[in-house]
Amino acid sequence: MDTSGHFHDSGVGDLDEDPKCPCPSSGDEQQQQQQQQQQQQPPPPAPPAAPQQPLGPSLQPQPPQLQQQQQQQQQQQQQQPPHPLSQLAQLQSQPVHPGLLHSSPTAFRAPPSSNSTAILHPSSRQGSQLNLNDHLLGHSPSSTATSGPGGGSRHRQASPLVHRRDSNPFTEIAMSSCKYSGGVMKPLSRLSASRRNLIEAETEGQPLQLFSPSNPPEIVISSREDNHAHQTLLHHPNATHNHQHAGTTASSTTFPKANKRKNQNIGYKLGHRRALFEKRKRLSDYALIFGMFGIVVMVIETELSWGLYSKDSMFSLALKCLISLSTIILLGLIIAYHTREVQLFVIDNGADDWRIAMTYERILYISLEMLVCAIHPIPGEYKFFWTARLAFSYTPSRAEADVDIILSIPMFLRLYLIARVMLLHSKLFTDASSRSIGALNKINFNTRFVMKTLMTICPGTVLLVFSISLWIIAAWTVRVCERYHDQQDVTSNFLGAMWLISITFLSIGYGDMVPHTYCGKGVCLLTGIMGAGCTALVVAVVARKLELTKAEKHVHNFMMDTQLTKRIKNAAANVLRETWLIYKHTKLLKKIDHAKVRKHQRKFLQAIHQLRSVKMEQRKLSDQANTLVDLSKMQNVMYDLITELNDRSEDLEKQIGSLESKLEHLTASFNSLPLLIADTLRQQQQQLLSAIIEARGVSVAVGTTHTPISDSPIGVSSTSFPTPYTSSSSC
């Protein structure tokens, strides 16, 4: 309750701050303000109390004051006129006392008497909120209020349900994402709680004001939307109309605010998703860095421990500890990476629980990745006996080898992180436009798609880098596997191992160098398989590079067509020439030379065969020119023609429609023509009759011969007009 006599309630447990006082004041300042208000305003009379109910314990020391207030109130009631029955019915249907809104059960609560004149106008919505408010006041353990100085009372604390209802939607989204995704953001404080604390500090020292029946207080109950739309409702007699108008305005603003919250939720999700994308990319980069660092340190430790110092030295222990530290960091980065993956899955699919994303396939994939990245040389010296059979002598060989070999070679499996980094840094994956187009075409942007695009853009570079990397790694692996059983230092030498890998990679296999151990044989087997695939890719890339482009094909086809046209013309000319020569030597000459005739006949047949062969080549060239590109061009031409035909058909339909409208107009005109003709004939007949009557009148006045008057109604004799049964002489 503020100083103006208004009781504001923002729903259950939600109290808006007073706009006049933006910050809380201290206790001394509040006491001074209360004293000034008490000096300026006289104490109003108290509301009537029921005589059958005793007063609360907090007001028992003041019975004389209450009696005086009751007497004054009774006098005012006698002076006031009676109220209408409609207002009393409203009062009986919804009995609401102002003290129920902010007072505690132990404080003074005066029940309304039977003849109370406090007229209230609550709506059905307000009444339901008041009943809920009373229920929470009576049943909530946190709704008790402590009386402050000056007879004031503190506002009740909100229940957990009320606190959940008053929370900001943006804060709720952030808190829910933190709850389900594993703490991406720090928990944010609830805005409504801070506002409630501010209101408690402001209204702590305000005294409880009592109103007389002649000036009843207005109880304004509004929702959070009403408080945002209307911060303060003034106290005036026409309160019902203004409160209904405010309720209508608040209900009209509900849907835009819901849409705004929805837009805020979508914007927050998109921003959160973008942040997760960036974090996932950085985690992948860091994982690749630490993975490559562990591989490099492993290679250095293996080479140094073979030639310079032993496995039990401090240098080897320090390097292995460094490898273990980098492996632990790598495992943590991988866990963080998959955490971001799960969070992205939750955001993309709108899931409520992150456990929905943990399918058996994902769990198996994460476990396999953790196992691959966890393999590394353990600090310390561990040995085992390794037995093998030499290649050419077939004698068994037994040597004591380090366990680090078994744990070092699988560390090269960490190179799969390169493909992940390439995917996350690819423009096709990071560009929003390309991802939108791919989603419309149902394309999955994965590592396979990125490698295909790289093979299309720069196939030579990709094959070169892959072949050289595979060559070096396989050669070093063969060297490590063969060093314990190679007594002649052939395959254990790095250059010799590179030669062995190269001839195996190219599927040559001279046989001068062969591996002794199963480890080396397995590496050579994998190298041969990869070499066959790379060789096929090289052949395909070279063939694609040697293929003519579209422009080059068109130029080549044009030149070949020109040459074939010339050859056809030459062959046709030869046919005509030989035909003329044969006719000349057989018909025109007196003495026939049979040798020349046979010669020209032979050339004539050769010219005919040459003409046929050239025409066949021209047909083949035309068939080769009809490629897919030409078909697409023809399709475009046909599409243009069909479009033009459609336009013309539309124009023709429009013209036919105009002709139909004109024909309808002509039909209507022809239908109205008989009526027009009848009207015209009638008018002419009337004019003729009038002319005859005028002529007859003139003849009578002059004294001409008398014409007998006809018996017709218009005064014209039947003999004046010829009939079909009278001749022209009778007329």
From Swiss-Prot:
Would the keyword Cytoplasm be found if you checked this record's keyword annotation? yes
Q: Which cysteines are joined by disulfide bonds?
A: none
Keywords, alphabetical: Calmodulin-binding, Cell membrane, Coiled coil, Cytoplasm, Disease variant, Ion channel, Ion transport, Membrane, Phosphoprotein, Transmembrane, Transmembrane helix, Transport
In this chain, composition skew of type Polar residues spans 112-132, 239-256
Q: Which Gene3D superfamilies match?
A: 1.10.287.70
Q: Name one GO biological process term.
A: potassium ion transmembrane transport
Intramembrane feature spans: 494-514
Give positions of region: Calmodulin-binding.
561-637
Q: Where is the composition biased (Pro residues)?
A: 41-51
Q: How is it regulated at the activity level?
A: Inhibited by bee venom neurotoxin apamin.
Disorder named in the UniProt entry: Zimmermann-Laband syndrome 3: A form of Zimmermann-Laband syndrome, a rare developmental disorder characterized by facial dysmorphism with bulbous nose and thick floppy ears, gingival enlargement, hypoplasia or aplasia of terminal phalanges and nails, hypertrichosis, joint hyperextensibility, and hepatosplenomegaly. Some patients manifest intellectual disability with or without epilepsy. ZLS3 inheritance is autosomal dominant.
Q: What family classification does the UniProt entry report for this protein? A: Belongs to the potassium channel KCNN family. KCa2.3/KCNN3 subfamily.
Cite the domain annotation text: The coiled-coil domaim mediates heteromeic assembly.
Name of the protein: Small conductance calcium-activated potassium channel protein 3
Where is the organism placed in the taxonomic lineage, from the top? Eukaryota, Metazoa, Chordata, Craniata, Vertebrata
